[in-house]
Design a protein with these regions (language model features):
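Active-site anion-handling motifs in enzyme catalytic cores
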Residues: 1-381
Length: 381
């Protein structure tokens, strides 16, 4: 049996895309352990996988006292993880396969908890896979290396992470993010969409947080839209890809929409599932995006794309596709001037046809990398 774990819910449509694509790649019944199963059902994942809740249950009484003693003696919180997520761990079966599907969860706080999951699953006889992942090289300390070495298989979605992970765990292969095989659903286009001449834009609160000056990042988006309206006859479609409370793309996008809607050329796409969002992105002339899986939707459908990136995954994916990240990724941490995003858009516009031709040439073979990950999982059974 194959299980997917460490899934935070489908209001992050990148997470939803990973689940749908993984199901397509593995072509077998999957069990999804989710911390927000209600959101998964909202977007129809219950029609794709069997959803189980992996909620955190508070410790109390004797269990809480035992945890405190264990923590004092060992300095580890693994006891807390094991018992607060006992619904998941009680279901772990010897010989079953468990895919950690967060992708870049090791790049954020809480990687010790990921290590706890990995260790406990192995103690119960399960096999673990670090699936479609990215990893910041600077995050590889001794404790993390010990954890990473424990995985039975690692499928790295870009070469920067691959080199880092391969040095620690020889069971590491280079693949493409599973979402490159995501199905596309084309809904009717909204009024005002210019067929073949609509520029897609995705912005996120996370980008504003990662920028040295969040105000400059927002101003860069404002200036970009104004620049497109002033220098082209294209329409602009604002497309959200994450709608989680306190991290909702619709907040900055709605603010931008309200400012520029009087132009008659700016549209705001509402929330949809990831396949439907890919349908809109695939029909854009070009795409400028902050969310990784929004940009993957563009790359995979050969839409010339500029990424406003903040991590290794953006750089690594662009480097693997184009041979360089220069001009294709604007690191948000380095953003100093509101004109930079518009300047990079101008480069994209000037090279639009050559970029599209390159994507059409390389994408079929690149997408096949995702299937090598599925083949590697089948060999674990």
């Amino acid at each position: 049996m194959i299980n997917l774990y460490y899934h935070g819910g489908s209001e992050n449509h990148g997470c939803e895309a990973i689940v749908r694509s993984t199901s397509k790649l593995l072509s077998t019944k999957l069990f999804l352990w989710s911390t927000a199963p209600n959101t998964d059902c909202t977007y129809g994942l219950d029609n794709v996988v069997s959803i189980q809740e992996d909620g955190s249950v508070p410790l109390a009484g004797l269990k809480l006292l035992t945890f405190k003693m264990h923590h004092k003696l060992t300095g580890s919180d693994i006891f807390y993880t094991k018992f607060s997520h006992r619904n998941f761990f009680s279901a772990v079966q010897c010989g079953d396969i468990y895919l950690s599907i967060g992708g870049d969860n090791y790049c954020y706080a809480g990687k010790d908890i990921l290590g706890h999951y990995n260790q406990i699953i192995h103690e119960k006889g399960g096999k673990t896979v670090f699936w479609g992942c990215s990893f910041e090289p600077s995050e590889m300390d001794a404790a993390t290396a010990k954890d990473i070495a424990r995985y039975n298989l690692i499928t790295a979605r870009e070469s920067i992470s691959y080199e880092t992970l391969k040095a620690v765990n020889p069971n590491t292969i280079l693949v493409a993010d599973p979402a490159f095989v995501l199905d596309t659903v084309e809904l009717p286009l909204p009024e005002g969409w210019k067929d073949g001449n609509t520029i897609g834009i995705n912005a996120s609160p996370l980008i504003m947080q990662c920028a040295k000056d969040g105000g400059v990042a927002y101003e860069a988006y404002r200036h970009l839209i104004k620049h497109i309206l002033d220098t082209t006859d294209a329409a602009v479609a604002l497309i959200p890809h994450v709608v989680i409370e306190n991290n909702d793309d619709r907040i900055p996008l709605r603010n931008l929409y309200e400012e520029f809607v009087p132009s008659g050329r700016v549209l705001l796409i509402e929330d949809h599932n990831c396949c439907e969002l890919k349908g809109y992105i695939s029909r854009c002339r070009m795409f400028i995006g902050a969310r990784t899986h929004a940009t993957i939707a563009a790359y995979s459908t050969c839409v010339p794309t500029l990424v406003l990136g903040y991590s290794v995954k953006s750089k690594g994916i662009a480097r693997d596709i184009f041979g360089t990240e220069e001009h294709y990724v604007l690191p948000v941490q380095e953003l100093r001037d509101k004109n930079e995003l518009a300047d990079d858009f101008d480069w994209l516009l000037a090279n639009e046809e050559s970029i599209r031709s390159h994507l059409k040439c390389v994408m079929p073979e690149y997408i096949q990398r995702a299937y090598t990950a599925a083949e590697a999982v089948s060999r674990l059974k």
